[in-house]
A protein has these predicted regions:
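Nucleotide-activated sugar donor-binding and catalytic core shared by glycosyltransferases
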Residues: 1-237
Length: 237
């Protein structure tokens, strides 16, 4: 709960003899921090020391259709590697993507786990698995997070705590953390396909931009931590 939530609830309850509503915050920030602490320390590589890997996370068809052509063109002029995870991985989508990338001379491999992902040299790695994004964010340099061109952008807290600059579509404003990520320049929202590759250049070609966005992303999560403790303290008081 933030100050705006507090005001709304207070106005609703002002006739019910309730005069004090403490602000505890959002326990989800604590949860994502706790999950990140379980990550092996050796896997927590500084953003500028990571390989040039772009993670396309929770990709909806609307995201794919919006940016795929520009991504292929961009990859032909760079050396970055792409990890691609569909929102709902399935063999039909994997085959479509694999054929398309291969036709454009971009070597592609489909894997069912991330156990050996660091040993794969293919330009495109299509990951046919779920529940692996939290780990992958710690080894990627930039992430595109899907959903922003359809139902709403997916979880941004996991890439943020890993210090990964994010790019996502325009439907994000109902998520307060997403609004803060944009306002603090920890990530960028796009509405046109050309903006996608422009921001890839912005991050991959500038250590300063990458570092600033990475630090901003982590600070957003850390600055909102402590909600769980506040709730427990209030319940025990």
């Amino acid at each position: 709960m933030d100050e705006n939530d507090q005001k709304d609830i207070f106005n609703y309850l002002k006739n019910k003899s309730i005069s004090e509503i403490p602000i505890a915050g959002n326990p989800r920030f604590d949860q994502v921090i706790q999950m990140s602490r379980k990550q092996h320390e050796l896997d927590k590589i500084d953003i500028n020391k990571r390989e040039d890997i772009l993670l396309m996370a929770s990709m909806h068809k609307e995201d794919r259709n919006m940016i795929l052509a520009h991504l292929i063109k961009y990859l032909k002029n760079t050396d970055i590697q792409v990890y691609w995870i569909s929102h709902e991985p399935n063999s039909q989508e994997n085959k479509y993507l694999s054929n398309l990338f291969n036709r454009n001379s971009l070597s592609t491999e489909v894997v069912n786990s991330i156990e050996r992902i660091g040993q794969i040299d293919s330009r495109i790695v299509i990951i046919n698995a779920v529940g692996v994004l939290a780990d992958l964010y710690w080894i990627t340099k930039v992430a595109y997070v899907g959903g922003g061109f359809s139902s709403g952008v997916h979880n941004l807290m996991e890439p943020a705590v890993a210090g990964v600059p994010m790019i996502f579509g325009p439907r994000y404003e109902k998520f307060k953390e997403a609004v803060e990520i944009v306002s603090q320049n920890a990530g960028r929202s796009i509405s046109k396909s050309i903006d996608f590759t422009n921001f890839l250049d912005f991050y991959f070609n500038s250590k300063e931009n990458l570092t600033h966005s990475s630090e901003s992303a982590r600070n957003i999560i850390l600055n909102h931590s402590g909600a769980s403790a506040k709730i427990l303290n209030h319940l025990n008081s």
